[in-house]
Amino acid sequence: MSTEQTSADQTSTEHSTQQPTAQPGRPEVAAAGEWTFPEPRVRELPNGLTALVLDVPGQYVTSVRLTLPLPLRAEPRELEGVAWVMAGLLDEGTQQHDQRELSEMLERLGVGIGAGMSEGSLGVDLDVPQRHLGEALTLMTEIVREPAFAPGEVTRAVRTRLQDIEQERASAPHRAMRQLAATYYDPQTRASRPGAGSAQSVAAITRDDVVAFHREHVHPHGGTVVVAGDLTDVDVDVLLEASLGSWTTPGPAQEWERVPAPRAQDAARVVLVDRPGSVQSELILATSGPDRRAPRWPAFPVLGYVIGGAPNARIDAVLREEKGYTYGIRSGFRPRQVGGTFVVSGSVRADATVDSLRLLDEILRGVADGVTPVEATSGVDFMTLTAPGRYATADALADELAHLAADGLPLTFTSDTVAAMRRLTPEDLDAAWREDVGTDWTVVVVGDASAYRDEVEALGIGPVSVVPA
């Protein structure tokens, strides 16, 4: 044996007998700490507006949210859609500045502004760099107090809305939602009709109608303005009093009570919206659910996540991952001012329509058998551990505060809900589903009805009817 070989063998033996170097242990991941939604400073302005002011250091774009009580049911039946037309025209010129001048002023200040309607309120959203907050609030006040509603702008807004209605009719998801509202709700309630109006009612809207609706229904009293951002060296109270706090209207504001939207007596049925030749089907299933005042409300966002809020939730685990019928179907609770709905929606391959409905029926009925501990933990963790990220920016904080104001909920609601979620058990989730979620479903399918009507009837999930697209 050569000297080199002997040396190599000795070296190999030495290496093989050496003890491995100890590796430092991995750092332990600490449990997430308690999180609470920041509480704003509350101030009442002279004209009846409530101001919620939230200092968010480091957020140099300031978010302002103005929420005024104004339900859609305030619209005359023959002019439904006038509220949305009015809201969309607020930033299209004022009595002091025409549309072009106003646009240039907003652009120079870096202001983003928009307005829209919800079930119970008019909302005006504004975002602006902190240094221009005072000027932006002055313009916001001008916009809500004295919009011009120029005849040409009103005509354009009405035409645009009519075009949107045609486009929505061609969109399967929009068509499905419109049919769901018409089928689910009592035909006498406002919720059964399109929130932004029908083609017939929108076409009837004139400038005089828009002016009259604004004059009668847009008042500061009872409203809320939220200001959130880095407010270092900013005297928000002075800015608000000089702007929105100085806004007054001649007439008294009407007091609006929260009222339920009754369900139709024949809502538990299947409606096939016929679109011949469709290669996929849009599905929507809905039943009754709670509003955010329900004692068990913290359980429902978790249930929505477990059932259909993620790719690994019960619905997609079967219809997407196992069957390959869909790119994704989602579910969630949709609270209203009083009561609410639980909605499942998504699209599937046309040839999988019947089996998808069968599987959804099985999955939804199976929730009554109970939520597993793993599912409960997963849902609770997602909803609670992502909360700090969801509310990390000034605009998200302002949005949530505006929603709380619109719903008349306490400022501690979000923190209380997250804290209650952390304590949820599988038994709590089971009780919430059993006690507060309906068992009779409204089902809408948009697709080629001739391809599966008989098979859908054979499923026995409800009486079946067909309507044209």
Cite the ranges covered by each PLM segment.
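Envelope-exposed proteins and targeting segments
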Residues: 39, 47-49, 60-66, 120-122, ...
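Residues that act as N-cap/strand-start positions at coil-to-secondary-structure junctions
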Residues: 36-37, 107, 267, 427
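His/Glu-based metal-binding/catalytic segments typifying zinc-dependent metallopeptidases
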Residues: 54-70, 80, 182, 252-312
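M16/MPP (pitrilysin/insulinase) zinc-metallopeptidase core fold and M16-derived inactive scaffolds
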Residues: 63-127, 193-194, 309-325
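Charge-rich, well-structured scaffold segments of protease-associated domains
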Residues: 2-5, 9-24, 44, 101-255, ...
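Short, surface-exposed beta-strand/loop micro-motifs that present aromatic residues
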Residues: 41, 50-55, 212-215, 267-274, ...
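N- or domain-start disorder-to-order transition segments that initiate the globular core
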Residues: 17-62
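Short, charged, low-complexity patches
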Residues: 79, 83, 133, 137, ...
